[in-house]
């Protein structure tokens, strides 16, 4: 197994296998991709993935390669359960069905999970939006359990742009830890460095905060620089080692080393996390859960190949 998985979210080539091969050719061993139109709420034909799932799984297994799916940007976990303006039962809600569709594809192709943004409360109160998120996530997890769909909903740390919920990392982790240990088998965390920077955190501080409480739940890192000032609550990515980026190079270098060190600690059998619940701490002490350190560069070609090599050197 790789010590750390490094890859990118790049435009899809003719096939997913071709895209995976492109990542491999450029020194990476993981890929993030969309399986739905990122700007549309339409649900595609799952047969498109059923027919190629075995080939994707075989490529990933033989080359120790990881796949991550990013959800459609149209999904808002905090919104009401409506189709248009019409309130509907949650099982008929179109955006709920879209996320379940993406999670089903994730299971089919052997993806680790689906990264999804936390919700925006829009015109409702933050409390109302958070309750919608709780209900939505719990319902989707129940659906995954009933249908034996083995994949994860990976919640991404927010920048706090507009009415985006949970920009405070303590609040984000508290919300995550409201879910039971059984529910958390279907959950994970994605740390986006540009987002936490926008939310007001040094990226290494954010990493340590998550590791102190939920290290084995931290599955994916979106490793980006930022175009905006720290604490601006704005989500604007920049190329990782861009000299115009606002996240200092030394912070990025230290962050990469932290990721590698934590992965090595975990492989040596040292529990990486402490839990707030005594019951869960005891269970953790008996059997440390292991996760993969997956770094995704959200950088266009051709820069990502150079960045992969630099990350390997810094790690």
What are these regions (language model features)?
Residues 1-101:
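N-terminal pre-domain/capping segments
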Residues 4-10, 29-33, 67-71, 114-116, ...:
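Hydrophobic faces of well-ordered beta-strands that scaffold small-molecule active sites
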Residues 21-28, 46-68, 100-110, 140-149, ...:
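Acidic (Asp/Glu)-rich catalytic clusters
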